[in-house]
UniProtKB/Swiss-Prot annotation:
One of its GO terms (molecular function) is GTPase activity. GO terms for cellular component: cytoplasm. The gene is mnmE. PROSITE patterns: G_TRME. GO terms for biological process: tRNA methylation; tRNA wobble uridine modification. It comes from Anaplasma phagocytophilum (strain HZ). It is found in: Cytoplasm. GTP binds at residues 227-232, 246-252, 271-274. This is tRNA modification GTPase MnmE. Residues 217-371 form the TrmE-type G domain.
Length: 445
């Protein structure tokens, strides 16, 4: 995909399906010729909305459209761009696609954003931020995506790379012009700056993966013995019948998950098989998967029936003392009791799904337990494993620098670190990286 940048492309930039308005974007050197193909013969002023009739090759009317023209380089892609705002009818879209495909080609996923990157309109972190913005489902995800798509990460990473390149410039002056430079003084400053940068990068990487967790959601697993009410709670949180509920123990065999929004933050809630001793092979596999889900979860909700009076002789399922574990007694129906109950020195939260009691408090507890799992608003955090990998490599090579190294070797370490930081923003890149990033975009972006 990276190599084909001289032709003209088009795609639907709005969602598929019926809608009041649909936008078709055209980008490339033949954008205006494509518009002429649709019967628009008069001049179109840049950045001015024009109402025009679009026709097929036989002169038959397709639709009345609002036409916008953005000449290069002042467009999103940096190329000549035409946007057609038409009625969101499947028939209209199909006819326009049929006409345009005779002259230009359909864009590949993410190709508009790729061209924007290749033409210097955005860096890779901004491009990834655009993808996150499109996929954002909660307020917090939206805020993080907006910060990234408007250049906060780019500014941070470029600043660190600039520091490295400045250090490298001073170091190369010592190498190339030793007679003109007070090497001992300059090298002292260089090593001091390297040490400071290592500390900053190390602190930045030691972030608890908050940025990535905000993208993917905090994982909350519901655990407990069979018939503890796990699936009933799961359905209540999901606000739909996502899991089968039955009086027969062992109904849930596989791990089910649903994405929810709690207070503007993303969570993935998982329902699991009841954990008990079983000779049934399928149930054993479900129990195995439940335990694996527990190991990977950020928060565990451990449920027991309300009738439970002691934990003695009961398989604890997981570490009940873990600060990320919430203990719950379910089926507390028709009982006039406080919100919690103490059993063997452990506090259990009481819920009744059927009477809608305690669910709101449980969601509040989940929020409190996950408060430090998300970045604070305004913070600039690592948002993907790709970023983290390059930053870790940069820190690794810079941290390996020592004063006993020949300065030529130190310079090479700094070059590698600058290269790794450049890979994050795309200041240096390879086709494999670009294809991997932009292929995850939707067609019209």
């Amino acid at each position: 995909m990276v190599k084909r940048q001289t032709d003209t492309i088009f795609a639907l930039s709005t969602a598929q399906g019926k809608s009041g308005v649909a936008v078709i974007r055209i980008s490339g050197p033949s954008s205006m010729e494509a518009l002429r193909l649709l019967g628009v013969k008069d001049d179109i002023s840049p950045r001015v909305a024009h109402c025009r009739l679009l026709h097929d090759s036989k002169g038959r009317l397709i639709d009345q459209a609002v036409v916008l023209y953005f000449p290069k380089p002042g467009s999103f892609t940096g190329e000549d761009v035409v946007e057609l705002q038409v009625h969101g009818s499947r028939a209209v879209i199909r006819l326009l696609y049929e006409e345009l495909q005779t002259f230009i080609r359909i864009a590949e996923p993410g190709e508009f954003s790729l061209r924007a990157y290749l033409n210097g309109k955005i860096d890779l972190t901004r491009a990834e931020g655009i993808a996150d913005l499109i996929n954002a489902e909660t307020d917090a995800q939206l805020r993080q995506a907006l910060a990234q798509s408007t250049g906060k990460l780019e500014k941070q990473y470029d600043q660190w790379r600039s520091i490295l390149l400045d250090i490298l410039t001073d170091l190369e002056a010592c190498i190339d012009f030793p007679e003109d430079v007070d090497s001992s003084c300059v090298l002292g400053g260089i090593y001091n700056n390297i040490e400071k940068l290592c500390a900053v990068l190390g602190q930045y990487l030691n972030d608890g993966h908050r940025g990535e967790r905000l993208r993917s959601g905090v994982r909350v697993v519901i655990l407990g013995p069979p018939n503890a009410g796990k699936s009933t709670l799961f359905n209540s949180i999901a606000r739909r019948n996502a899991a089968i509920v039955s009086e027969h123990p062992g109904t849930t065999r596989d791990v089910l998950e649903v994405a929810i929004d709690i207070g503007g933050y993303p969570y993935i809630v998982l329902d699991t098989a009841g954990i008990r001793e079983s000779c049934d092979g399928i149930e054993q596999e479900g129990i195995k998967r439940a335990k694996m889900a527990a190991e990977e979860a950020d928060i565990k909700i451990v449920m027991y029936p309300y009738e439970t009076t002691s934990m003695q002789g009961i398989d604890p399922i997981c570490d009940l003392q873990d600060e990320k574990t919430i203990l719950v007694l379910s089926k507390a129906d028709n009982v006039d009791l406080p919100e919690s109950k103490c059993i063997d020195g452990k506090e259990f939260h009481l819920i009744s799904v059927h009477q809608d009691r305690g669910i709101g408090k449980l969601l509040t507890l989940i929020q409190e337990k996950s408060r430090d799992s998300f970045p604070q608003e305004g913070d600039v955090f690592i948002t993907s494993q790709r970023h983290r990998s390059h930053l870790q490599k940069a820190l690794q090579v810079v941290d390996a620098v020592s004063k006993v190294m020949p300065i030529e070797i130190v310079a090479e370490h700094l070059r590698i670190a600058a290269y790794e930081l450049g890979r994050v923003t795309g200041a240096v890149s390879g086709d494999d990286i670009l294809d991997d990033i932009f292929s995850k975009f939707c067609i019209g972006k």
